[in-house]
Regions:
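Solvent-exposed loop/turn and edge beta-strand elements of beta-rich ligand-binding domains
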Residues: 1-330
Length: 330
């Protein structure tokens, strides 16, 4: 027996006084289905007369009795680094791979993503517009993946942690909505917190006509009248604590000092030694990094040359934590 988010068995009933031998009656199930993402639900029905069982329809394999509740999970990776780390550049590309479960093959779906700021819990923007991306697809199997590709400028995002939110919609176009109105396999299924499924059953235990009704939350911009809507929200993956949805944009600051004086001044000698302490934040711990430094002439912006070569230095390190320091010695 399916249980709702409160641990209660999902049941319902309806009383009827039929005027004819053949007919229909709706049995409405209203429950918190927030715990059922990825589940397949089958509605079993009994008809009783004076508390005596006179009819049963309980076929676990009957598609007409079946409701599918999709589920999605995502993993966002930077196109260049291949990990959950991007640079604060003009042209950042992030691919969010959405893994879906329990869709109906042959129907059209749209997955829509938004880049969120983990600290402010608001969408990140470029030019005053939210950073979004989407993909429309028609799955060949119930379970699979689809990529959502984001391209944006991250120049202003140094030090920020981005979380990619995804929503999955069933597109109610002509092919989806009208291909076969009596086929339950092409009806709308949604894991909304408040879910209402209506099973139509006649009094002679016939179940050839089944319809699903979904109460849609206005917060999701879906009107309650599903006949008017072009899309229905069927799955959401929005978790600020999910590392798979997270992209970090590092930030570094440096402090250069003469090794002998410990200040920003040094004596003009042949064996000058400068220690540039690089403070970093928002790295992915456990990964290996390399800091590359170049001494630049402030008067003209050109590299400082010594013995015919640019004055450079580098340091490799494995970040134990997201925030820390490393010395680059020139």
């Amino acid at each position: 027996v399916i249980k709702d988010a409160d641990g209660k068995a999902v049941t319902s009933e309806a009383e009827i006084t039929p005027e004819t031998a053949d007919g229909k009656v709706d049995v409405d199930f209203i429950f918190d289905g927030s715990n059922l993402a990825g589940k397949t639900i089958v509605m079993f029905e009994e008809i009783r007369y004076e508390d005596k069982l006179v009819g049963v329809h309980a076929d676990i394999n009957d598609e007409a009795q079946t409701i599918y509740v999709p589920a999605i999970a995502t993993e966002a990776l930077d196109e260049v680094t291949g990990i959950h780390l991007s640079n604060a550049g003009d042209d950042v590309k992030v691919k969010d791979t959405v893994t879906y479960k329990n869709l109906i093959q042959g129907l059209t779906y749209r997955v829509a993503g938004t880049v969120m700021d983990k600290d402010t819990k608001k969408p990140l923007q470029n030019g005053g517009k939210d950073i979004t991306a989407e993909a429309v697809f028609t799955p060949e199997t119930a379970d699979g993946t689809v990529d959502v590709e984001f391209t944006f400028s991250a120049k202003e995002f140094a030090g920020k942690t981005m979380v990619l939110f995804e929503k999955l919609y069933l597109v109610k176009n002509a092919d989806n909505a009208d291909a076969n109105p009596d086929d339950t396999s092409s009806k709308d299924k949604t894991p909304d917190d408040t879910q209402k499924a209506s099973e139509s059953e006649n009094t002679q235990n016939k179940t050839d006509n089944t319809s699903n009704k979904v109460e849609v939350d206005n917060e999701n911009n879906n009107p309650a009248d599903n006949s008017e809507v072009k899309e229905v929200l069927i799955a959401v993956h929005e978790d600020y604590s999910d590392e798979n949805q997270t992209i970090c944009v590092p930030q570094i600051k440096t402090t250069a000092k003469d090794a002998k004086s410990g200040t920003s001044m040094f004596y003009a000698e042949k064996s000058a030694k400068i220690v540039d302490t690089v403070s970093y934040r928002n790295l992915v711990p456990g990964k290996k990094y390399k800091v590359v430094g170049t001494a630049v002439d402030k008067s003209n912006g050109a590299p400082v040359i010594a013995n015919g070569n640019n004055v450079t230095a580098e340091a490799e390190f494995v970040a134990k934590e997201a925030t820390g320091k490393v010395d680059v010695v020139f």
